[in-house]
Swiss-Prot record:
Encoding gene (name): BNA5
The name this protein goes by in its record: Kynureninase
Taxonomic lineage: Eukaryota, Fungi, Dikarya, Ascomycota, Saccharomycotina
Broad class of the protein's primary localization: cytoplasm
Reaction(s) catalysed by this chain's protein: L-kynurenine + H2O = anthranilate + L-alanine + H(+); 3-hydroxy-L-kynurenine + H2O = 3-hydroxyanthranilate + L-alanine + H(+)
Source species of the chain: Scheffersomyces stipitis (strain ATCC 58785 / CBS 6054 / NBRC 10063 / NRRL Y-11545)
Pfam families assigned: KYNU_C
């Protein structure tokens, strides 16, 4: 893999980097004699926090100006309505047709609301209905901690203890779960499972789970008595999804990673239409409810009667933050403009494969399943090497490990990369996650990032750093 090859690929796959604000050497406080201080960084951290679309700043300022000019009246009489702005009372509704294709849902199956864990908790309360022996929740042992906390407290709210959580561990010698392993766990607990909930993409390894296959297996084996949900924090905006076609019951996601909504940005949910099409004042499924999920025509009548909207919007509890909504809208409009996730996925596969090819060609690379001398300086890749089993992320495990941060290989590599304005995500003690995103990363900068990584290991080997 050469620089010329990277440049050739950049002519084949377009970049939309100009649509984004990219941190520079100067803005990051990094001194450089090799580059102009206003040179862009190489930002490979969109799996942690996406870059800001340049249009976001104006979108937010427009709403601040509406607040200045009309105050509360902007809820129903926005000063920018003639220019296409939405009154605040309906501020989130234009996002529904933008989000639905990204997750592969019908418009009546999605809502933009809340934050990831609060949304997940709301869905769990609604969908976890233990009965007789069916009380257990199957999920992964290495789940993002917030998910574990949610599952643990959910079973405790029902009077159960931690034994009602079935946590699936990665088998010795592997770096990620296999679909067959998940199926076996379903079989082993088939009469006791009430719910199965995995991540669409595993945050640490970057593994893309076979959502359709797993969902269908659980439903068929459980005779539709087991609910299947997905945490899509690292999948939404990253890989193509078809939640409705895959018959997923519910899902939740955040938007500040691949959807570029900004830190702590507003999140979203999916609920299959079978659970909301019969909503009525007398037959709705009890949930954590609020006035923003009530029929809009009666919402401001302040009635003591819950009349849920016949869609996933009925799960909304409070009116959303206008600033958060318009921030994510800027990015969603950009996704639509460039052709959506399926089109971006083609470049994403090529870009991540290009990085993988660079890494495995290094003298410092060793296969994770090899009996390698663990005292030798080097790295392996935890992420599945099969491009269909991952998104836009490679998780790189460095060795050897030292408890002293000044000596530890990962810390030293990470520091070297940062000093060269290459922004990645550390996962202590020994992992760096690299996420080349198709929207704003190029093959050329991915090439340079890999070269700086190899330089760092050369200098560590010769004790120069």
């Amino acid at each position: 893999m050469s620089l010329e090859k990277a440049q050739e690929l950049d002519t084949k796959y377009p970049t939309y980097k100009d649509e984004f604000a990219v941190p520079t050497f100067k803005s990051l406080g990094i001194e450089t004699s090799q580059f102009n201080e206003n040179t862009d960084s190489i930002y490979l951290c969109g799996n942690s926090l996406g870059l800001m679309p340049k249009s976001t700043k104006q979108a937010i300022n427009d709403e601040l100006n509406a607040w200045i000019e009309r105050g509360v009246e902007s809820h129903f009489n926005h000063p920018g309505q003639s220019e296409g702005k939405t009154p605040w009372v309906d501020i989130d509704l234009p996002l529904v047709p933008l989000v639905a294709p990204i997750v592969g849902a019908k418009e009546n199956e999605v809502a933009v609301m809340g934050s990831l864990t609060s949304n997940l908790n709301a869905l769990l309360i609604n969908f976890y209905k233990p009965k007789d022996k069916r009380t257990k929740i199957l999920f992964e042992k290495q789940a993002f901690p917030s998910d574990y906390y949610a599952f643990l407290n959910l079973v405790k709210l029902h009077g159960y203890d931690e034994s009602h959580l079935v946590q699936l561990k990665v088998l010795p010698g592997n770096t990620y779960l296999t679909t067959e392993q998940i199926k076996k766990a379903v079989d082993d607990n088939i009469d006791e499972l009430a719910m199965v909930c995995f991540p669409g993409i595993q945050y640490y390894t970057g593994q893309f789970f076979k959502i359709e296959e797993i969902t269908n297996y659980v439903k068929n084996k459980g005779k539709n008595e087991i609910v299947v949900g997905w945490d899509l924090a690292h999948a939404v905006g990253n890989v193509p999804l078809k939640l409705h076609d895959w018959n997923v019951d519910f899902a939740a996601w955040c938007s500040y990673k691949y959807l570029n909504s900004g830190p702590g940005g507003i999140a979203g949910i999916y609920v299959h239409e079978q659970y909301t099409k019969d909503n009525s004042k007398t037959s709705f499924s009890p949930r954590l409810a609020g006035w923003w999920g009530n029929n809009a025509s009666d919402r401001f009548k302040m009635l003591e009667e819950f009349d849920p909207i016949n869609s996933a919007l009925s799960y909304r509890q409070s009116n959303p933050s206008v600033i958060d909504v318009v921030a994510v809208k800027s990015s969603l409009e950009l996704f639509k403009k460039v052709g959506g996730v399926p089109k971006l996925r083609k470049k994403s596969i090529a870009l991540t494969q290009f990085l993988q090819d660079l890494l495995v060609s290094s003298k410092y690379y060793f296969r994770s399943d090899n009996d390698t001398d663990r005292s030798k300086i080097g790295f392996t890749i935890l992420t599945p090497l099969n491009q269909e089993e991952r998104g836009a992320q490679l998780s790189v495990l460095f060795q050897p490990h030292y408890d002293d941060k000044q000596k530890n290989i990962m810390e030293r590599v990470s520091g070297y990369l940062h000093n060269h304005a290459i922004i990645c995500d550390e996962r202590r003690p020994d992992v760096i996650r690299f996420a080349p995103l198709p929207l704003y990363n190029t093959f050329e900068e991915t090439y340079y990032a890999a070269q700086r990584l190899f330089e760092a290991l050369d200098k560590i080997s010769s004790e120069e750093i």
